[in-house]
């Protein structure tokens, strides 16, 4: 059944129907309420479900309220109540020695980063004092996390010197076996190096550990902190190791920079 026109009340057929302002109109009946100018869907303005042209569109006016004695009294009373509440809150928080800060996601991320750095520094100091006498410590989750963070830093330091070992190993049939610093000093003092022939299977044993994986960046990322790295979409991230939920540690192959990066920005490629 065909609807009726909102202005003239007659039946509106599909060939001349205009559906606007939740009503149906004839094309000839869809005009400004004031000047009767014909309107269309591109130049009309609706006010209280009636069409208007741009010139006669009702302007909303604001009424200025005078500062009467009653309004001034209410304003002064509100200010006094605000001062009383502020003083009461100040007295309650006095002596606590801290300010209440909103716990935003950015502050949470910075807090986690500072905790990781503190744990790594603590473990480094512990390693320096090892052997001078120690107290047995129970393996709790915090100690496990410290050990994991230290392993990440140690692996990163190992990757930093590994290219030099590869360059030395390019001599056919000869490699320089990795030795501990103490063993190297002892050999050097005795006046001879430590070399031997090797086979292809021995060379394979010196490849990087299986957990040092390569990833590719899916998005651009700008570093938000000193211990993070920036990368672009398509960059390859090598020697990637997980740190905790949501964060990894790796080297951007294009720039050579090493640091922390978000895990949801990269994908595994090998």
From Swiss-Prot:
Indicate where the modification Omega-N-methylarginine is found in the sequence: 96, 132
Pfam families per record: LIM, Nebulin, SH3_9
Q: Give start and end of each LIM zinc-binding domain.
A: 3-63
**Superkingdom of the source species:** Eukaryota
Where the Nebulin repeats fall, as residue ranges, is 61-95, 97-131, 133-159
The protein's matches in PROSITE patterns, at most eight in alphabetical order, are given as: LIM_DOMAIN_1, LIM_DOMAIN_2, NEBULIN, SH3
Q: Where is the SH3 domain?
A: 210-270
In-chain residues carrying the UniProt-annotated modification Phosphothreonine? 135
Q: Which UniProt keywords apply?
A: Actin-binding, Cytoplasm, LIM domain, Metal-binding, Methylation, Phosphoprotein, Repeat, SH3 domain, Zinc
A GO MF term: actin binding
Q: Name one GO cellular component term.
A: cytoplasm
Q: Which SUPFAM superfamilies match?
A: Glucocorticoid receptor-like (DNA-binding domain), SH3-domain
Residues annotated as carrying Phosphoserine in the record are 230
Q: What does the UniProt record say this protein does? A: Binds to actin and plays an important role in the assembly of the Z-disk. Isoform 2 might play a role in the assembly of focal adhesion.
Name recorded for this polypeptide: LIM zinc-binding domain-containing Nebulette
Organism, as annotated: Mus musculus
Q: Which gene encodes it?
A: Nebl
């Amino acid at each position: 059944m065909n609807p009726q026109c909102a202005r003239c009340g007659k039946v509106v057929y599909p060939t001349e129907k205009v559906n606007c302002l939740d009503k149906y109109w004839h094309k000839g009946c869809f005009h400004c309420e004031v000047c009767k100018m014909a309107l269309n869907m591109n130049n009309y303005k609706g006010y209280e479900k009636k069409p208007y042209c741009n010139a006669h569109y009702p302007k909303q006016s604001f009424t200025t309220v005078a500062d009467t004695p009653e309004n001034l009294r209410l304003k002064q009373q509100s200010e006094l109540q605000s001062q009383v509440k502020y003083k009461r809150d100040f007295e309650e928080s006095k002596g606590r020695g801290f300010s209440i800060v909103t716990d935003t996601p950015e502050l949470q991320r910075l807090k986690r980063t500072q905790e990781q750095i503190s744990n790594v520094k603590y473990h480094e100091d512990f390693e320096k004092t090892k052997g001078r006498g120690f107290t047995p410590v129970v393996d709790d989750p915090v100690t496990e996390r410290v050990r994991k963070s230290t392993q990440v830093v140690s692996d990163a330091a190992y990757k930093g010197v590994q290219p030099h070992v590869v360059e030395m190993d390019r001599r056919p049939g000869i490699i320089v076996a990795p030795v501990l610093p103490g063993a190297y000093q002892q050999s050097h003092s005795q006046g001879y190096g430590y070399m031997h022939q090797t086979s292809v299977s021995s060379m394979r044993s010196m490849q990087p550990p299986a957990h040092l994986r390569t990833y590719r960046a899916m998005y651009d990322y700008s570093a938000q902190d000193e211990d993070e790295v920036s990368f672009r979409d398509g960059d390859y991230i090598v020697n990637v190791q997980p740190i905790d939920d949501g964060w990894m540690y790796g080297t951007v192959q294009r720039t050579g920079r090493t640091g922390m990066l978000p895990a949801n920005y990269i994908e595994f490629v090998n």
